[in-house]
Amino acid sequence: ISFMLLMIFVLGIASVLTYYRMSALLQTNAEKHISQTAMQANGRLDALIAQINTLTTQVATDAYVQRLLLAEVQGKETPFSSRQSLLPLFSDYQAYVTGIKSLELYTNDYRRLFPLNETQLIDTIDSEWINAANWGKGSLVWIGIDPRDPSTVLALRRVSLLDRWFSSGGYLMV
């Protein structure tokens, strides 16, 4: 009986020691794995942000977009057919970046040119973000989570008119 009790005691101590060593090893490996995963995700996020920045710059400087917004600034309202012509243009740009759900183009007076509905920019986001985009003078301003769709993030860029001394021509929202 004493031999059995001694063996149970030794096995119990060995089990406890093995448990603590293995849990420490698993915890260390899990921390390393989480750290590597976070670094990879951060790298992918940085790449996506850079893609969105580049894409919105391309859209904002597109010759057709520039012509439409310049005409709007000069007081000529954009005809419906010209607004429809933005669909293939924006679809082509959206095809390059998988993280973009929509591109929206607004005039200086916050009227939406694309997509084709009459939602105002001021009804979509707070005026503080419009002011931030104006102060950024063409830089992309990250707004945050879209209140209408919590799975998306909003960003806004002021479109500067290249042929009008880089004055404001409108806004591009992603």
Describe the predicted segments one by one.
Residues 46, 60, 90-98:
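Short regulatory alpha-helical segment in sensory/regulatory domains of signaling proteins that mediates
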Residues 49, 79-83:
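Solvent-exposed, acidic/flexible segments
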Residues 1-73:
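Juxtamembrane extracytoplasmic/periplasmic/luminal helical "stalk" adjacent to the first N-terminal
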Residues 35, 39, 83-91:
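Short amphipathic alpha-helical segments
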Residues 41, 74-79, 118-120:
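Second-shell loop/turn segments in exported
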Residues 94-174:
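Extracytoplasmic/periplasmic ligand-binding sensor regions of membrane-associated signaling proteins
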